Amino acid sequence: MGCKLKVCFFKPESDLNPVAVERYEANILGCTRQFRYSTANTNTIDMALSVNGIPVVALELKNQFTGQDYICAINQYKNDRSSKEFAFHLNHRFLVYFAVDLYEVWMTTQLADSNTRFLPFNQGSNGAGVTGGAGNPQNPNGYATSYLWEEVLQRDSLLDLIHRFISFVKEKEEVVKNGVSRMVTKEKMIFPRYHQYDVVRKLMADVRRNGAGKNYLIQHSAGSGKSNSIAWTAYRLASVHDADGNGLFDSVIVVTNRVVLDSQLSLIHISEPTRLRCISY
């Protein structure tokens, strides 16, 4: 037996329900320096962000002026942050772990000691949505990585990420051992890469501003997560409202040759009163 508690209230699509707006504004977001995560040692994470007292984002911060960079932070996660700690168990506390220096941001959603896999969370050398190389553009007004705390981890954005992007999924996968094949269930947390976060939010902002009827061309390279971007966009379009609180779309139809999209839509579970299903012809 158990009792389900709602520990966070998310931003409603419109202001028509004042109670929903009040509950959203009552969320308490915190920032803790040198966050102690264990009762077995005195190790700390440089910074932890919490929502209503629950730690959800971990950041290890390094800077080149002291001879350290994001690689040092990644090694710290791999070697000094035991995956056996309760706070680091998948889907228990932290949802994402960032390794940050003055020029680059990398992230992972699951600590697995030396097997931890980090991915870049950078804008690209010429900025978001502009063709370029790896890394981030120079920032004349601050650090090259300041977009992380000035934009991505800003209050509304962080709650939006938790609400509409981050997903805990279970996938069946075939494993062959000693010539014997069997299906196993693997769990993982899905967190958008920066280009996915950026394109979905830009699309939604333009739709709210201009309504239906516009065409958009989105450039995605191979292996960049097109299916997830489509799924996130489809779910959000199904519930988007204009400035007057009116729903913009009655239905969302996705036409694609990506046969995996049906499973992607099922995996990207968003806590919205919408249901999407793929149909084939």
Per-region residue spans from a language model:
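Conserved H-loop
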Residues: N257
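Single conserved hydrophobic/aromatic residue that forms the stacking wall/gate
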Residues: I268-Y281
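ATP-dependent helicase/translocase motor core
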Residues: M1-S251, V260, Q264-S271
